[in-house]
Structure formats: structure tokens, C-alpha cells
Curated annotation (Swiss-Prot):
The active site is at residue 133. SUPFAM superfamilies: NAD(P)-binding Rossmann-fold domains. Keywords: Cytoplasm, NADP, Oxidoreductase. It is an enzyme of class 1 (oxidoreductase). Its main location: cytoplasm. Coiled coil: none annotated. This is Isoflavone reductase homolog. Gene3D superfamilies: NAD(P)-binding Rossmann-like Domain (3.40.50.720), UDP-galactose 4-epimerase, domain 1 (3.90.25.10). The lineage of its organism: Eukaryota, Viridiplantae, Streptophyta, Embryophyta, Tracheophyta. Belongs to the NmrA-type oxidoreductase family. Isoflavone reductase subfamily. PANTHER family: PHENYLCOUMARAN BENZYLIC ETHER REDUCTASE 1 (PTHR43349:SF35), PINORESINOL REDUCTASE-RELATED (PTHR43349).
Length: 308
């Protein structure tokens, strides 16, 4: 049997990237992270860089805007995982061009890690970001690059500390805002589990040219259920303030960045139901907890305990 794939990360020091890099190294993959000199010398990244070094991660000097450095880095590996942030999504075409030239990549994971962008009903500004991700998918497919798209839905560490309250610094004390009627199911995943599931998919033929949906059964919940679970844990009832879609849309239009971004993403999930309003067909996707039943994921019930 062939050894484990060598993996190159672009955006590996970012929010979700660091969890996937760690999962890669811990799973025994030769793990490479493309970094600029400025990242290595950035004091805010020192601790993370040291942690990566302790895992045996190799840093490769390069830049998304330096074609030669990209091609050189890509030629050392089998798999490329992009976890670049919102501002760099469109510039992944540069990465795709380098992958195409290098000619050796067995799998490319573009920066997704959210909704399935081909199955959304979004309004601006979320719509623009989703459209960019969808355009990147089409370029990958047109170039014939083998791929896996990872749909993770909500990051638990982002959305659960404040019970998915837009813009709130912590959990609600007396009142809780619920977008829509509160009975639409959404998905929340722990970042470490996202890392584990993503790395499991790297060498798996079942995820080749497919979407990997991370939708474990105990991580699918409505806002009403989430609030009830929180009330049970804290022993304190909250007044529920329901915001109809018309008002949600108005709030999005009136809000500034980043509040409007967060609200528009929550709108797709909690009002439109875009996490759970379609069936996963074998022709285009697989569900992570079904294909990797041995992964012990953290259910929402357990994740919430750390915020009580």
C-alpha cells in the first residue's frame, strides 16, 4: 500500500487552517505550510509557529502571488489544501494555475469549510462570497483537477459561545434573539473534528471529486432546541425574541461590516434552512460521520458545557 499523502497548506496559519494542519501532522502525513517571511516573524503567530514545529510541520517559503514559489512548493507534495480567508478566495485561481502547471497533485481542497455553495439561497453580502467559492469550484472542474469540497457549516467555536447571537460577545443573560421561527435545523461542528474529518478524506477514493458534508446526527439542531438545551444547562429561562425574515433582511441592509456578513450567513442557515434543506445524493457527496464512523466527534450537548 502506498504511504500517506504529503499535504501542502495554503492559509494554514488562519482560523480553520490551524486545526486541519494539526490533524494532518497528528495523522502522520508529511505536512507542509506555505508561509511568507512576514508570517514567520509576526509576533502574533509565534506561539502557533512553535506549536506547528513541535508537530513536525515543514514551513515552505512562498506566496500566493509568486507563481514560481507556488509551483516549487506544490511539486513536493501530493495534496493541496487551501484554507485562505475571505479576501483571498478569488485569488485561488493563481493556486489552481500553479497546480495545473506542477501536474502532480492527486487532490485539491479549495477553501470552502462552510455552506455547500451550490445549494444556497443567500442575500448579500454572503451571496458574493458564496458566488466566489462556486466560481472557484467551476475553475477546478474545468481544469480537470481532482478535488474534494468540504462543507462544514458552522464552526462551533465561532457560533456557540454566544448561542449564535449576531455580534454578541458572550451568551445571552435574559433575552435571546431567534432569526425566523427557530425551528429550522442547522449544523455546528467543533473545529478539531472538522480537521479530523478533512484529513480522513485526503486519501479516500470515496471522497474523490465529491463534497464531504460534515453533518453528524448529534450536531444538527434548531435554534429553539439550542436555547432549550442552554436553559436546561444553566437553569435559567430566556425570553425569546423572534425576528421575521422581512426584518432580518432589513437588519442586514442597515448593518455595516462585519455584522451584515454574519447576519446574512445566519439568514441562509436559520431562515432559509440551507444547512439541511437538501438530501445528500451519492452522485455528488458523502456524509462524514457515515463514511468515518470511527471518528469520535464532539456533540453539541458536550460542546456547550464549556460555555456554561
Amino acid at each position: 500500500m502506498a504511504g500517506k499523502s504529503k499535504i501542502l497548506f495554503i492559509g494554514g496559519t488562519g482560523y480553520i487552517g490551524k486545526f486541519i494542519v494539526e490533524a494532518s501532522a497528528k495523522a502522520g502525513h508529511d505536512t507542509f505550510v506555505l508561509v511568507r517571511e512576514s508570517t514567520l516573524s509576526n509576533p502574533t503567530k509565534t506561539k502557533l509557529i512553535d506549536t506547528f514545529k513541535s508537530f513536525g510541520v515543514t514551513f515552505v517559503h512562498g506566496d500566493l502571488y509568486d507563481h514560481e514559489s507556488l509551483v516549487k512548493a506544490i511539486k513536493q507534495v501530493d495534496v493541496v489544501i487551501s484554507t485562505v480567508g475571505h479576501a483571498l478566495l478569488a485569488d485561488q485561481v493563481k493556486l489552481i494555475a500553479a497546480i495545473k502547471e506542477a501536474g502532480n497533485v492527486k487532490r485539491f481542497f479549495p477553501s470552502e469549510f462552510g455552506n455547500d455553495v451550490d445549494r444556497v439561497h443567500a442575500v448579500e453580502p454572503a451571496k458574493a462570497a458564496f458566488n466566489t467559492k462556486a466560481q472557484i469550484r467551476r475553475v477546478v472542474e474545468a481544469e480537470g483537477i481532482p478535488f474534494t469540497y468540504v462543507a462544514t457549516f458552522f464552526f462551533a467555536g465561532y457560533s456557540l459561545p454566544n448561542l449564535a447571537q449576531p455580534g454578541a460577545a458572550g451568551p445571552p443573560n435574559d433575552k435571546v434573539v431567534i432569526l425566523g421561527h427557530g425551528n429550522t435545523k442547522a449544523v455546528f461542528n467543533k473545529e478539531e473534528d472538522i480537521g479530523t474529518y478533512t484529513i480522513n478524506a485526503v486519501d479516500d477514493p470515496k471522497t474523490l471529486n465529491k463534497i464531504l458534508y460534515i453533518k453528524p446526527p448529534h450536531n444538527i439542531i434548531t435554534l429553539n432546541e439550542l436555547v432549550s438545551l442552554w436553559e436546561k444547562k444553566t437553569g435559567k429561562n430566556l425570553e425569546r425574541l423572534y425576528v421575521p425574515e422581512e426584518q432580518v433582511l432589513k437588519n442586514i441592509q442597515e448593518a455595516s461590516v462585519p455584522m451584515n456578513v454574519g447576519l446574512s450567513i445566519y439568514h441562509t442557515a436559520f431562515v432559509k434552512g440551507d444547512h439541511t434543506n437538501f438530501e445528500i445524493e451519492p452522485s455528488f457527496g458523502v456524509e462524514a460521520s457515515e463514511v468515518y464512523p470511527d471518528v469520535k466527534y464532539t456533540p453539541i450537548d458536550e460542546i456547550l458545557n464549556q460555555y456554561v
